[in-house]
C-alpha cells in the first residue's frame, strides 16, 4: 500500500501555502466557509461540529474556532453532514458507454469526486491514442480522474485478436504524467506467478507507484507468489473466505458492485473497524441506466449502511480515505486542514442523500456541467473513426455441425457473475439434452478476416432472437448470442453498419440498437439520452427471455479469457482454468 506522501499528486505552490496558512491562522479572509454543518469523523467515529474553512482548492481549517472567521462567501449547509468526496478505486469508464466528459457530468453531482480509471478498453481497440485521449480528458476535468497505465493489452497474449498493442516503451512514456497513479490490473496472473520476465519488467517499472491486481478465486501458494511479485490489491474476489485470505496476506480488497459482477453482498461482512483501511469500493463496470436510477459509489455506501449495518464512519471511510491512502493520494480522503476541499454535503447520511458537492474548493452545479458538456467534449478531441473492419455476414457463417450421440462443451452463465462454469450437453436428432442451449459466436473486427469462432451457451435465458455487441472484453470483437443463425447475422450486420454498438433482434427484425461511434465502445449522447436508450434495449432484450439483469454487460465478459472457467474468443473456446484452448466436442 502506497502510504507515503506522493508529491507527484499534491500540486501546491509556496504562494498557495502562504495564503492557506494565513487563512488557517485567522490572518486572512477565506474564499468559502461552510456553516451549520457537522463533519463525519472518519478516524475516530462520531462527528465534529463547526464550520469548514476553504481557501483556493484546500481546507484551511475545521471546527468551532472558526465560527467568526471572515469569508468572501458563506454556504449554509442547513444542518447537513459533511463527508469527503467519494472515490471509485477501480473502473473502466468506457464500460459506462459514456465519454469521460459525460461520465463526469453524470457522477460528480452524486458525490463521486475521484476515480481511478484503467482505460484498457479503448487501448485494446486504439492503442496509445486511446490512452492519450483519456489523459486529455483527465487534464481538463473538474472531477479528479486518475489513470492506471493499462498493463495487459491484450488481456492474454496469443488468445485473441485485438486492435492495437501497448508496449512497455509506450507505457513508460505515461508513467510520470501527473494523472497517472500506477500500473493497472495485471490480468495475466499465471504469467506473473511463473516469473515471466516481460511481466516482471512492467511491475519493476511501476513499483514506486501502485500495482493493481486481478486474481479471481486464486489461493494457496499461487496467491502467495502473486503477492510476492508486488501486486497490492484485487477487485475480482467473489467469495467471503477468498477475500479474507487476501486481506490476511496483506492485499487490499476492492469490493466490487458493478452492473454484472455483484460482489458486495458476499464481501461486505468482512468489513470492520480493524481492516477497513485495507478495504475499498469500486464499480469496475456500471452502465448509465443504473447510474441514473440507483447511483454510483453512493449506491454502494447506502447498501453497506442499510443492508449490512456497517457503521457510518466505516462505510464512508472505505468510500474515500482508504482508497486515497492506498494510491498515495494523501491530499484526498479526509475533511482536514491542508486536504483538498472535495466535500459532499448530505441531508441524510444514512440514505446518502446528496445535497451539495464541492470539488477542489468550488461548488458544483449540475446544470452548468450539462450546459458545458458538448464544448468540453469537443475540446478533448475524441478519436472518432470507424474501427469495424469487418464485412457483412450471412447465416451460413454461423453454421455448426453436430453428430448425434456426441457430447459438446457448453459455456454456462451464472447470472450477475463474471465467472462461468464449463458443462457439456449431448446432441441427438431432437437437439441437445437441455433446452436452454443457445449459440454464441465471436467475430474479430480488426481486418484479419477470420471465420467466426462459434460455441454453445447455457443458462443465459435466451429463448428467441439474438443479441450482438462490439463491447466484448477485453479485445472488443463482435460477440453475438442467438437461437437462429439468420437472426444472429441480422444483429451482427446492424452493429457493423452502426460502426459499433449494441443490437437486439427478434421475430426477424431489429427491435432496438445503440450506435457507439467512439471505438465501438462509447456514445457521444448525454447521460440521460444514453440511459433512455439502454432502457429501450433492455426492454427489447427482456422480450427474448429471462435474461440476466444486465444482459449486454454479462455478455461482454463471455470473451474474457482471464476469468474462469470457459470462454470464447475470436480464436476459439478457451479453458480459463487450464489457460489453454479446448475443443467444442468433448473427446476425453
From Swiss-Prot:
One of its GO terms (biological process) is adenine catabolic process. Signal peptide: none annotated. It catalyses: adenine + H2O + H(+) = hypoxanthine + NH4(+). It comes from the Bacteria. GO terms for molecular function: adenine deaminase activity. Keywords: Hydrolase, Manganese. InterPro entries: Adenine_deam (IPR006679), Adenine_deam_C (IPR026912), Amidohydro-rel (IPR006680), Metal-dep_hydrolase_composite (IPR011059), Metal_Hydrolase (IPR032466). Its cofactor is Mn(2+). Belongs to the metallo-dependent hydrolases superfamily. Adenine deaminase family. This is Adenine deaminase. It comes from Escherichia coli (strain 55989 / EAEC). The lineage of its organism: Bacteria, Pseudomonadati, Pseudomonadota, Gammaproteobacteria, Enterobacterales. The gene is ade.
Amino acid at each position: 500500500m502506497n502510504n507515503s506522501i506522493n508529491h507527484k499528486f499534491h500540486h501546491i505552490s509556496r504562494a498557495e501555502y502562504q495564503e492557506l496558512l494565513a487563512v488557517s491562522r485567522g490572518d486572512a479572509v477565506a474564499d468559502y466557509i461552510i456553516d451549520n454543518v457537522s463533519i463525519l469523523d472518519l478516524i475516530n467515529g462520531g462527528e465534529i461540529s463547526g464550520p469548514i474553512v476553504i481557501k483556493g482548492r484546500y481546507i484551511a481549517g475545521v471546527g468551532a474556532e472558526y465560527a467568526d472567521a471572515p469569508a468572501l462567501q458563506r454556504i449554509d449547509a442547513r444542518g447537513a453532514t459533511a463527508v469527503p468526496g467519494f472515490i471509485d478505486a477501480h473502473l473502466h469508464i468506457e464500460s459506462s458507454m459514456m465519454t469521460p466528459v459525460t461520465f463526469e457530468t453524470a457522477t460528480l453531482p452524486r458525490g463521486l469526486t475521484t476515480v481511478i480509471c484503467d482505460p484498457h478498453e479503448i487501448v485494446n481497440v486504439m492503442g496509445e491514442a486511446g490512452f492519450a485521449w483519456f489523459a486529455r480528458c483527465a487534464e481538463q476535468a473538474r472531477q479528479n480522474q486518475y489513470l492506471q497505465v493499462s498493463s495487459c493489452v491484450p488481456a492474454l497474449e496469443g488468445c485473441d485478436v485485438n486492435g492495437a498493442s501497448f508496449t512497455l516503451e509506450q507505457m513508460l512514456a505515461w508513467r510520470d504524467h501527473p494523472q497517472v497513479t500506477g500500473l493497472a490490473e495485471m490480468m495475466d496472473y499465471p504469467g506473473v506467478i511463473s516469473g515471466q520476465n516481460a511481466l516482471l519488467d512492467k511491475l519493476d517499472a511501476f513499483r514506486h507507484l501502485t500495482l493493481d491486481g486481478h486474481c479471481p478465486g486464486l489461493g494457496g501458494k499461487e496467491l502467495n507468489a502473486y503477492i510476492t511479485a508486488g501486486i497490492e490489491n484485487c477487485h475480482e474476489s467473489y467469495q467471503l473466505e477468498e477475500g479474507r485470505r487476501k486481506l490476511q496476506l496483506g492485499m487490499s480488497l476492492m469490493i466490487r458492485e458493478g452492473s454484472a459482477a455483484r460482489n458486495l453482498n458476499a464481501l461486505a461482512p468482512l468489513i470492520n473497524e480493524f481492516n477497513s483501511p485495507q478495504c475499498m469500493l469500486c464499480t469496475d463496470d456500471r452502465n448509465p441506466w443504473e447510474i441514473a436510477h440507483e447511483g454510483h459509489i453512493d449506491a454502494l455506501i447506502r447498501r453497506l449502511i442499510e443492508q449490512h449495518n456497517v457503521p457510518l464512519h466505516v462505510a464512508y471511510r472505505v468510500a474515500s480515505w482508504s482508497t486515497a491512502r492506498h494510491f498515495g493520494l494523501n491530499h484526498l480522503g479526509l475533511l482536514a486542514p491542508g486536504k483538498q476541499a472535495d466535500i459532499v454535503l448530505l441531508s441524510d447520511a444514512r440514505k446518502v442523500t446528496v445535497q451539495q458537492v464541492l470539488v477542489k474548493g468550488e461548488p458544483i452545479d449540475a446544470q452548468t456541467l450539462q450546459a458545458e458538456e458538448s464544448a468540453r467534449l469537443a475540446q478533448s478531441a475524441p478519436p472518432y473513426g470507424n474501427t469495424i473492419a469487418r464485412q457483412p455476414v450471412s447465416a451460413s457463417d454461423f453454421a455448426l455441425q453436430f453428430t448425434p450421440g456426441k457430447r459438446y462443451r457448453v459455456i454456462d452463465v451464472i447470472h450477475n457473475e463474471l465467472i462461468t462454469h464449463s458443462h457439456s450437453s449431448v446432441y441427438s436428432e431432437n437437439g441437445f439434452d437441455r433446452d436452454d442451449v443457445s449459440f454464441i459466436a465471436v467475430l474479430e473486427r480488426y481486418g484479419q478476416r477470420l471465420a467466426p469462432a462459434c460455441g454453445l451457451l447455457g443458462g443465459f435465458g435466451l429463448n428467441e432472437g439474438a443479441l450482438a455487441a462490439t463491447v466484448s472484453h477485453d479485445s472488443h470483437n463482435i460477440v453475438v448470442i442467438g437461437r437462429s443463425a439468420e437472426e444472429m447475422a441480422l444483429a451482427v450486420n446492424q452493429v457493423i453498419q452502426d460502426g459499433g454498438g449494441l443490437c437486439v433482434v427478434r421475430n426477424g427484425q431489429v427491435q432496438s440498437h445503440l450506435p457507439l461511434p467512439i471505438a465501438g465502445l462509447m456514445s457521444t449522447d448525454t447521460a440521460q439520452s444514453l440511459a433512455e436508450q439502454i432502457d429501450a434495449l433492455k426492454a427489447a432484450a427482456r422480450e427474448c427471455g429471462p435474461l440476466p439483469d444486465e444482459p449486454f454487460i454479462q455478455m461482454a465478459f463471455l470473451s474474457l479469457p482471464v476469468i474462469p472457467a470457459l470462454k470464447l474468443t475470436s480464436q476459439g473456446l478457451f479453458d480459463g482454468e487450464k489457460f489453454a484452448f479446448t475443443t467444442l466436442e468433448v473427446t476425453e
